[in-house]
């Protein structure tokens, strides 16, 4: 019987711990502060930013949102980020992506102080993760959350296990591979140019799909008993629900995969809830480090 990995439940446990640890920090005179910056009126970004702000407040953080117009210049955004870098009440800075075309996203990401880079995208955090200094880095939230789900099934030491990550993005694929390597898995990164992708996947004890192609990974790509982590989220037509209706699916053909896998994350309700939980965990870690306290373990 396949184990359905409940990301909502795991995320709730993380958020409970973040809230408890935040109360302890506040009792010692430190309130974790998260600043979220959004440029423009993109509806999806507005929803994401609002949910992050709500969750930060629920955790007991000092939460600040900076909403800037679509025509904001790169220099104006740099100035805001530099001001937030200097603000001792702010421990985490998140600039919602994508940014308007007149702004160089890479420059903005690298303007954020590495110790406040709760998205884990700054080159210093990327470098620490890439060289195995996982405990010193702020790790990107989605792979960090996915890794906790894997640990819940397979344990923290993945020695002897084969892992395949489909996708090589800087946000998910590469950091995911580095986290698996740090846990002693034998890791393969596969992507659109990989020859015979199904064959590459069939040997994986742990399969992470992060490409954004709906239901690409079929049941016969999966090793029996494998742990399958589906990071993808796509909206596709759902005629069975009625004309014009849509549904959310992942990169994995779930109905096929659950017949083969040992454990699998659903979409929705798998990796998604973990992303925002790990953002809160990163903000707490940044505040703890800034105040000279031990980092909480998750």
Curated annotation (Swiss-Prot):
One of its GO terms (biological process) is tetrahydrofolate interconversion. It holds the Pfam family THF_DHG_CYH. Pathway: One-carbon metabolism; tetrahydrofolate interconversion. The keyword Oxidoreductase applies. One of its GO terms (cellular component) is cytosol. Its EC number is 1.5.1.5, 3.5.4.9. The keyword Hydrolase applies. This is Bifunctional protein FolD. The lineage of its organism: Bacteria, Pseudomonadati, Pseudomonadota, Alphaproteobacteria, Hyphomicrobiales.
């Amino acid at each position: 019987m396949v184990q359905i990995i409940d990301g909502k439940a795991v995320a709730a446990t993380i958020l409970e711990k973040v809230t408890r640890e935040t109360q302890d920090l506040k009792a010692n005179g430190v309130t974790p502060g998260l600043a979220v910056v959004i440029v423009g009126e993109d509806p999806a970004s507005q929803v994401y930013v609002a949910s992050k702000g709500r969750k930060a407040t629920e955790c007991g953080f000092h939460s600040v949102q900076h909403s800037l117009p679509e025509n904001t210049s790169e220099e104006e955004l740099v100035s805001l980020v530099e001001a937030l870098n200097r603000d001792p009440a702010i421990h985490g800075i998140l600039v919602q992506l994508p940014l308007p075309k007149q702004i160089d996203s890479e420059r903005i990401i690298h303007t954020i102080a590495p110790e406040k880079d709760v998205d884990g995208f700054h080159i210093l955090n990327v470098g620490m993760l890439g060289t195995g200094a996982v405990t010193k880095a702020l790790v990107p939230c989605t792979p960090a959350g996915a890794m906790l789900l894997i640990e819940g099934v397979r344990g923290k030491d993945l020695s002897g296990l084969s892992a395949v990550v489909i996708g090589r993005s800087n946000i998910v694929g590469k950091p995911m591979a580095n986290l698996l390597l740090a846990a002693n898995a034998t890791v393969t990164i596969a992507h659109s140019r990989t020859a015979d992708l199904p064959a590459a996947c069939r040997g994986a004890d742990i399969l992470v799909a992060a490409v954004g192609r709906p239901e690409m990974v079929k049941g016969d790509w999966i090793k029996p008993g494998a742990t399958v982590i589906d990071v993808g989220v796509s909206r596709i037509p759902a005629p069975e629900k009625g004309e014009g209706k849509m549904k959310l699916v992942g990169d994995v053909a779930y109905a096929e995969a659950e017949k083969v896998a040992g454990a699998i994350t659903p979409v929705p309700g798998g990796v998604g809830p973990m992303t925002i939980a790990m953002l809160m965990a990163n903000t707490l870690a940044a505040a703890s480090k800034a105040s000279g306290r031990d980092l909480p373990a998750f």
